[in-house]
């Protein structure tokens, strides 16, 4: 009797073991199927989406770079135009420099006569507002002294230009006279009745480009 019970118990354990093994095999096969599906999803869908994302990012990056370059070039164009040389359109016999025209006389006269001659040609005895202009006048005048537009009431008064603006003392004026003239040493002063050549200057409101006639420059 006991032997029969033992045999029956052993058979039950073997059946349960078989069921457990079958279940494990079934679960294993299902796991493989699920794993295969996951691999297929990862291998077919995710890379495509990832590549699409990469593509969109690259397109946007290129677009941003192109826009930045275009804006940079556009901002530089006005600056380049500002640096384009401006050629002053001066009357015959006058010399253009910057935004002014200058006339260097061959005749001689006192300071008052020289100023009157300049006024007759819609100008004044020469004014300068920078060292570049002053160096140009010194270079072009030759060896002769020339009256310019500086004058003062006395040595106790400031220097005034012929347009009634005060001289900034950009360059020291030598001498104790009441009228200024340009010499090889720079700006000097002397008596108004002394006869010298003179320089007239006037502003111009327009410039000529490179195309067409170009006035004489030094």
From Swiss-Prot:
Example of a GO biological process term: cellular defense response
SMART domains on file: CLECT
One GO CC annotation: plasma membrane
Name listed for the protein in its UniProt record: C-type lectin domain family 2 member H
Protein's organism: Mus musculus (Mouse)
Glycosylation sites: 110
Sequence ranges on the Extracellular membrane side: 74-218
Residues annotated as transmembrane: 53-73
Cytoplasmic side: 1-52
Effect of residue 8 to M: In strain: FVB/N
Alphabetized Pfam families for the sequence: Lectin_C
Membrane topology: Single-pass type II membrane protein
Subcellular location: Cell membrane
Organism taxonomic ancestry: Eukaryota, Metazoa, Chordata, Craniata, Vertebrata
Distribution of this protein across tissues and organs: Detected in ileum, liver, kidney and in IL2-activated natural killer cells.
